[in-house]
């Protein structure tokens, strides 16, 4: 756990050694899509600060812009206007190449449907983000071993996804999100495909990443029960912050 906390980021993309207290600073953020001559607004003039080490839940009805906002903060998509600064870096102004390098180094992703490679073992799925790093094979194996232990799957390293339960697959996905030691972990409906008991176990594990490793967590959920672990709730209504 300590090794993951203090390890150097794998891709080495430049970022302040000690990120500022406000990790995410969003100003006048808007996103729209064009369909022919029609403009379809998704987010409108969003202003938002998220502190380093916070655990934030984004809530709102379907179509409110939750996942779009998550994707913009994580550098998966770019805004139509406005700024998104993460750790002092205005990611909206980065080239696609630099944005990909920033994303690989500083953001861990957890998805509803796990997104594991079916032909790879749990160990290999977790190791995947490190293969383009300058870490040696021994260093990669050590880091993956720590991550597997952290999520309680040290005895499942050689199992492929079809040999694991849904909850175990999501634990592998969490370990993969953690493996590059990112500052920010984003989770889009991480319990949406799990039963209630397993979902609560996954949320407790995500909460552990926040409390014990200091990871900033941003989670999208429809479920008020799933949002209870968060320290801050942000509500979106028709692309506008409602809180």
Model-flagged regions — what are they?
Residues 21-236:
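ABC family nucleotide-binding domain
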Residues 1-32, 242-243:
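ABC-family P-loop ATPase nucleotide-binding domain
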């Amino acid at each position: 756990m300590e090794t993951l906390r203090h390890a150097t980021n794998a891709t080495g993309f430049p970022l302040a050694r000690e990120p500022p207290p406000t990790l995410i600073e969003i100003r006048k953020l808007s996103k729209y899509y064009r369909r022919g001559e029609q403009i379809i607004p998704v987010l409108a003039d969003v202003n938002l600060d998220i502190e380093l080490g916070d655990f934030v839940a984004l809530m709102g009805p379907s179509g409110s812009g939750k996942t779009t906002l998550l994707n913009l903060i994580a550098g998966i998509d770019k805004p139509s206007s406005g700024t998104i600064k993460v750790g002092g870096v205005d990611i909206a102004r980065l080239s696609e190449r630099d944005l990909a390098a920033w994303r690989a180094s500083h953001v861990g992703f957890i998805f509803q449907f796990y997104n594991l490679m079916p032909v790879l073992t749990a160990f290999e799925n977790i190791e995947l983000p490190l293969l383009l790093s300058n870490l040696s094979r021994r260093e990669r194996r050590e880091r993956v071993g720590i991550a597997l232990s952290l999520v309680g799957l040290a005895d499942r390293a050689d199992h492929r996804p079809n040999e694991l339960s849904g909850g175990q697959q999501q634990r592998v996905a969490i370990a993969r999100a953690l493996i590059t030691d990112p500052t920010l972990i984003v989770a889009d409906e991480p319990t949406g495909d799990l039963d209630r008991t397993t979902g609560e176990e996954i949320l407790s594990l995500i909460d552990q990443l926040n409390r014990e490793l200091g990871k900033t967590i941003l989670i999208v959920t429809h479920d008020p029960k799933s949002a209870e672990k968060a320290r801050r709730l942000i509500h979106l209504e028709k692309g506008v912050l409602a809180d």
